[in-house]
Amino acid sequence: GGACDPMSEPTRTLPGTGSIEVIVGSMYSGKTEELIRRLRRAQIARQRVEIFKPTLDDRYAKDAIVSHSELRIPSRSVKNAAEVLKHAHEAQVIGIDEGQFLGAGLVDVCEKLARMGKRVIVAGLDQDYRARPFEPMPQLLAIAEYITNTLAICVVCGAPANRTYRKVQRGGRVVVGGT
């Protein structure tokens, strides 16, 4: 266990124990920005950090996670969750952006890493543009020790927004980019 204040880092009471932190919300809600903030703090604390993103996410850079506000941190592109496991052995902290694109194996990989004593932080969409669960994020939420739910701002009325609004009617469930 530990404490989690929305404006601070989750803290663990037992040193060396692993944990899973999940950051979810709609598009433009600051998920990646929060992930980068936590990973930078871990780096400042001289912890070994490995950062991953799906190869599908090539919006800003192939070798970095980049927020919409253009914060960036170097990362490794992976095709699936199993590749995360291959490259995470030396790390104390593992960051994963756009977790919804890494498939059902993400849940098992995160559990394995946490059992190895690692702090695992995953950011991603928990719902698609139709407000339906975006697998595997709901399963990850079910096992997470710490959950942060971010809110966007509606550009029409200025109210907090918890849904992704799709502006284009093309494509399937996944359309990469700011649409």
Language-model-derived ranges and their functions:
Residues G1-P6:
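Short, Lys/Arg-enriched N-terminal segments with co-localized hydrophobic residues
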Residues S8-H89, D128-Q139, A152, V176:
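Conserved P-loop
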Residues R38, V109-M116, P136-I143:
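Catalytic-core regions built around general acid/base machinery
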Residues A45, M116-G117:
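Helix C-cap/helix->beta junction micro-motif
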Residues I94-G95:
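Walker B beta-strand of ABC/ABC-like P-loop ATPase nucleotide-binding domains
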Residues E98-L113, Q127-F134:
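Conserved ATPase-coupling elements of RecA-like P-loop NTPase cores
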Residues R119-D126:
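Structural recognition of the conserved hydrophobic beta-strand(s) that form the central parallel beta-sheet
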Residues Q139-T179:
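Conserved GTP-binding G-domain of TRAFAC-class P-loop NTPases and closely related GTPase folds
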